[in-house]
C-alpha cells in the first residue's frame, strides 16, 4: 500500500511510509498520525543509539526501587549499570547520593516509537519492538486503548479534544491526562515534553498536506 506524502520522509526512513499505511489502514489509525509520533519520539530512528529500528533512547538514570530491581534482574538491559550517584539525578530533581540504574549503551526507550522498557516490560524484553511493523501495530493498540480509557473517564470529551488527549496519552498515560483535564490544566502541562501534541499534529499535517490529518480515522 502506497502512502502519498506532501512532504517526503528522510531518505533512510522512506520505507516507513508503507509501514504506516499498511498498519494504519488495518488498525483504523491515521498513518500520518503514526508518522508524526515516530518523528516526535525518535526522529524516525535518527535520534536513537544506534540509529534505526533497533536503537534505543532515554538515557536518564532511574533510581533503584524493589520493582525496578526485580525487572532488571529478570531481564537486564545491556549496558545499564547499577551505581551510586553522589550528586543525584538532576533531570529527575533527585538530590544525591542516590543508588540508580544508569544507561550507558542502551536506553529505557525501545525502538522507533519509544516504548518504555518498564511500562511495557513484556513487549520490550521480547525484542519484538525492533521490527517496524510490530511496533507500529503495538502503538495503534496503545492509542486505541488510551482512547477507550479516556472515553470512560471523560465521557463528554469528544472530537478534536479527544483526539489530542489520546495523542498526549501516548506520552503521559491516559490516567494522568484525564486528571490534568479534570483539573483544568493544559495538555502541555501534562506531557513530559513541551509542545508534544502540537509537534505531532503539525508534522502529521505536513505529511498529509492538509489540516486535521491526525484526527481519528482521517
Language-model-detected regions and their locations in the chain:
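Non-catalytic cell-wall polysaccharide-engagement segments
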Residues: 3-27, 71-218
Amino acid at each position: 500500500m502506497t502512502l502519498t506524502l506532501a512532504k517526503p520522509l528522510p531518505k533512510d526512513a522512506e520505507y516507513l511510509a508503507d509501514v504506516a499505511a499498511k498498519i494504519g489502514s488495518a488498525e483504523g489509525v491515521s498513518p500520518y498520525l503514526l508518522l508524526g509520533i515516530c518523528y516526535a519520539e525518535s526522529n524516525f530512528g535518527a535520534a536513537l543509539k544506534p540509529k534505526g529500528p533497533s536503537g534505543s533512547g532515554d538515557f536518564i538514570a532511574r533510581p533503584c526501587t524493589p520493582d525496578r530491581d526485580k525487572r532488571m534482574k529478570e531481564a537486564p538491559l545491556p549496558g545499564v549499570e547499577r551505581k551510586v550517584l553522589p550528586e543525584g539525578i538532576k533531570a529527575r530533581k533527585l538530590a544525591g547520593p542516590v543508588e540508580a540504574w544508569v544507561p550507558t549503551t542502551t536506553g529505557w526507550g525501545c525502538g522507533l516509537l519509544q516504548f518504555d522498557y518498564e511500562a511495557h516490560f513484556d513487549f520490550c524484553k521480547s525484542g519484538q519492538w525492533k521490527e517496524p511493523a510490530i511496533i507500529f501495530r503495538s502503538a495503534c493498540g496503545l492509542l486505541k486503548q488510551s482512547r477507550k480509557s479516556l472515553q470512560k473517564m471523560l465521557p463528554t470529551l469528544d472530537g478534536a479534544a479527544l483526539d489530542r488527549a489520546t495523542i498526549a496519552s501516548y506520552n503521559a498515560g491516559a490516567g494522568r491526562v484525564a486528571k490534568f483535564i479534570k483539573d483544568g490544566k493544559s495538555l502541555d502541562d501534562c506531557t513530559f515534553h513541551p509542545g508534544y501534541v502540537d509537534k505531532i499534529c503539525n508534522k502529521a499535517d505536513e505529511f498529509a498536506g492538509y489540516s486535521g490529518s491526525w484526527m481519528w480515522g482521517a
